Amino acid sequence: MIWLNGRLVAREQAHIDPADRGLLLADGLFETLRAYRGHVFKLEDHLQRMAAGAAELAIPLPLDPPSIADAVRETLAANQLAAADAALRITLTRGPGQRGLLPPDDPLPTLIISAAAYHPPPSSDGFVTVTAKRARRNEKSLTARLKTLCYLDNVIAQTEAEAAGADEAIMLNNRDAVACGGRSNVFAVIDGVLTTPAIEEGALPGITRHAILALCKSERIEVAERAITRAELRKAAEIFVTNSLLEIMSVRQFDGADLPAGAVTRRLAGAYSGLRP
């Protein structure tokens, strides 16, 4: 069952207007969330990020965040996931519009919520990662800070990584600094300091990234947000990537160089597990 514009419908009966700007122009936003035993983790944070992005793009929210939260829970229940581990996606588009780029004067946004059972990938060995060569993050673009529907660079990067036998692409920005993973934020222990690309480097302000930075304070782990060169990443003592579904995934190889699963990664993974509902 899909939640579409105010009601639950069977997936095969969920119809989107062919003139929807999300389909035609990627004019919209999305959030990916994880539920543990039916409890959606960091739901308010995800909805706040979506609301902030919608305000930035002048896309009206068809419902207030508490009502969207209710719809999320309804979607879980309708898919028999009210007590299960699940992955959810909330998609917001500007809705249908006339031909051309300019948005309609009175948009009728489309809101879609979907849910499916989630089974985490095996994490005992960690991810193999490679630097993406064909796609980059534009650190100067407004959309680099927003979780927009325009994910083609990420698709290209992840396709390239898969072709190389890797699990995750590491994307650089236009200044050859590390920005993020194809579907993740990147952290590395460099010269004894846990370091992550600053938002200004083209990193998405991830919900899990924010949680890790907060955990570093409570765990008294020194952390820095700054530009990271590819050469620095190659010499890192530890690397891990984060997102809402993966949580903290250690990296066992970057561009052919093997890495151990380090103490900082294990410590933060343990602390993060304590945050789960």
Regions found by a protein language model. Name each.
Residues 177-199, 205:
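Glycine- and Gly-Pro-enriched alpha-helical subdomains that act as flexible
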Residues 208-209:
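Secondary-structure junction motif
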Residues 1-170, 174-175, 204, 213-277:
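Conserved alpha/beta cores of soluble small-molecule-handling proteins
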